[in-house]
A protein has these predicted regions:
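Membrane-proximal basic amphipathic "stem/tether" segments
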Residues: 1-35
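Active-site and donor-binding regions of nucleotide-sugar-utilizing enzymes
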Residues: 29-166
């Protein structure tokens, strides 16, 4: 599986390089893969961006990875759309781990939005090698939690806990 992820990462980066030929736009991209619907946080942030920056386009791409084999094949094509939007936006806001981590040197500013529930569970690097987590090799192949410029959280009280996972 690690080999497959590494090959996929090379392919995705090659496609991303092609998409970077297109101009960057005044656009904020929201990516979410845990659900097909945006969270209230995403909608509120999108609305505030629209209010403060009416000339900035906002794009929501919310789609969970399907369970079926053919659904996963279809999701690969959806990822191409994500790559194009990523290559042509100025800011991307992530609600969960996403394709951005697989890209080497993404062009836009990358913001990871973390919900307060994160202090109630272990995640990311704090679970490597444990039952609920990935192996170190898999985490490295996925480039888990890489490429973030900023991480949004509910407050300063969450910082130490979140640093363990990132």
């Amino acid at each position: 599986m690690v080999f497959v992820l590494r090959v996929a990462r090379i392919i995705l980066n090659a496609i991303y390089i092609i998409f970077k030929i297109f101009p960057q736009k005044n656009k904020v991209l929201f990516l979410r893969q845990q659900s097909d619907d945006p969270t209230l946080d995403i909608l509120m942030l999108r609305d505030k961006i629209r209010e403060l920056h009416p000339n900035c386009k906002t794009v929501l791409m919310c789609k969970s990875v399907p369970k079926s084999f053919f659904g996963k094949i279809g999701y690969c094509f959806y990822m191409l759309g994500q790559l194009f939007q990523l290559a042509t936006c100025k800011v991307v806001i992530l609600d969960s781990y996403s394709i951005v981590s697989l890209i080497k040197n993404p062009r836009p500013m990358v913001v990871q939005m973390w919900h307060s529930i994160g202090t109630m569970k272990k995640f990311g690097y704090s679970t490597i090698g444990k039952k609920e987590g990935h192996s170190r090799a898999m985490a490295d192949a996925m480039r888990m939690h890489k490429n973030y410029d900023y991480i949004l959280c509910a407050g300063k009280g969450y910082v130490d806990h979140l640093c363990q996972g990132f």
